[in-house]
Amino acid sequence: MLRIADKTFDSHLFTGTGKFASSQLMVEAIRASGSQLVTLAMKRVDLRQHNDAILAPLIEAGVTLLPNTSGAKTAEEAIFAAQLAREALGTNWLKLEIHPDARWLLPDPIETLKAAEALVKQGFVVLPYCGADPVLCKRLEEVGCSAVMPLGAPIGSNQGLETKAMLEIIIQQSTVPVVVDAGIGVPSHAAQALEMGADAVLVNTAIAVADDPVMMATAFRLAVEAGVLARQAVPGSKSSQASATSPLTGFLEALA
């Protein structure tokens, strides 16, 4: 069970809504993933239409919506988008994204911290997408963010946990949930993140661009479940030396 702010989730897999070939395929994949928290970009939703092709099927599916501020380049733009989302969707939950460079889509740490502090004061449940910077993540926690979402690699790159060393520090020091976001390309990446101690992962591109998104969503669901179980089982410690699993001493003595 995962708790963030006032909500609890059975699934440790969060999903996105971008890049799917159709809204029907998007919903089928989300259902197959078992995800209960789904993020959507406000810039892609027509808030004037109750039957919006993205929003309507998500509401019907009964998932918790996590609007994001993707496309915002400054704290001011992100705050404005957040206020629109709260008014339109009736939720104070927000994935805070500020990336001024459209090529790399890396989060702006200064603007993110500035916006996070302001939004928390306005009553938002803020989940900030940020670099894998332990100092920044701690500052975001201190200003009241309900979770932190450090990247594993650049958005949509499918490179995996390129920031593993920093993620381990963030996980070790954090007192709020850590959700590894961006760069996760295959189910084994997700399992590794959960084994490391991350509380959840957010996956979009890896599922949406697969030849079979529904099958890939199922694979991610199983991988995340495996990662959680592996962590709970407490793996054995690493060793620089070999340790025989079947000692031969007694057997050889019996033959002597």
From Swiss-Prot:
Source domain of life: Bacteria
Pathway assigned in UniProt: Cofactor biosynthesis; thiamine diphosphate biosynthesis
Entry's Gene Ontology BP terms: thiamine diphosphate biosynthetic process
Subcellular location field: Cytoplasm
One Pfam family hit: ThiG
Residues forming the catalytic site: 95 (schiff-base intermediate with dxp)
Catalysed reactions, semicolon-separated: [ThiS sulfur-carrier protein]-C-terminal-Gly-aminoethanethioate + 2-iminoacetate + 1-deoxy-D-xylulose 5-phosphate = [ThiS sulfur-carrier protein]-C-terminal Gly-Gly + 2-[(2R,5Z)-2-carboxy-4-methylthiazol-5(2H)-ylidene]ethyl phosphate + 2 H2O + H(+)
Keywords of this entry: Cytoplasm, Schiff base, Thiamine biosynthesis, Transferase
Residues annotated to bind 1-deoxy-D-xylulose 5-phosphate: 156, 182-183, 204-205
Functional note: Catalyzes the rearrangement of 1-deoxy-D-xylulose 5-phosphate (DXP) to produce the thiazole phosphate moiety of thiamine. Sulfur is provided by the thiocarboxylate moiety of the carrier protein ThiS. In vitro, sulfur can be provided by H(2)S.
Protein name, per record: Thiazole synthase
Organism (species): Salmonella paratyphi B (strain ATCC BAA-1250 / SPB7)
